[in-house]
Amino acid sequence: MMSRVLRWAISVFLASLPQTGLAADSGLITMPSKYSVEVTIQRFEAAIRAKSDQGWMVFTELDHAAAAEKNGLKLPARTVIIFGNPRSGTPSMQKSPTLAIDVPPKALVWQDDQGKVWLTFNSGAYLQDYVYPRHGLPSNPGAAKAFDEFLKYAAEQATD
């Protein structure tokens, strides 16, 4: 069985590779979960809440499958978790109000057609190199690294 660190390193490496077509440099990190969608969500949110003393919090969940069902459509599980740290995000939004359309960060817990559960989120490098500059904010490699370290912790708690 692949170690957590190796699995994380491979995920980050693959997300950083140049890609072709419309998905070029997507910045997405996707990790398999050994748990159900519900348990993966619970574990991811618990990991975030465990760091509330550092300012991290879960804002809400968006259940796309439930919305589809209410409209007579079928969709495998697709739940977006909106989470963040107002201590770090608020100062940036004070400088550029339009940043609020792209943050707080999100994670997607989803199930593929074969029933496998996945956790997907943006890398810190993507947020710092593409999202922040889009709003006229400078890239901050230190913040990107800290965000990636936090997400490594939360993702491992959720999926392993």
Model-derived regions, located:
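Terminal, regulation- and interaction-focused segments at domain boundaries
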Residues: 23-55, 160
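Bacterial N-terminal signal peptides that target proteins for export
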Residues: 1-9
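Sec-dependent N-terminal signal peptides
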Residues: 8-16
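Stable alpha-helical elements in mature extracytoplasmic
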Residues: 40, 44, 64, 143, ...
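N-terminal signal peptide c-region/cleavage motif recognized by signal peptidases
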Residues: 18-20
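C-terminal partner/receptor-binding element of secreted or periplasmic proteins
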Residues: 125-160
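Compact, glycine-rich, soluble single-domain proteins
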Residues: 49-51, 59-105
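Beta-strand/loop substructures that line and gate deep hydrophobic ligand-binding cavities in soluble
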Residues: 106-137
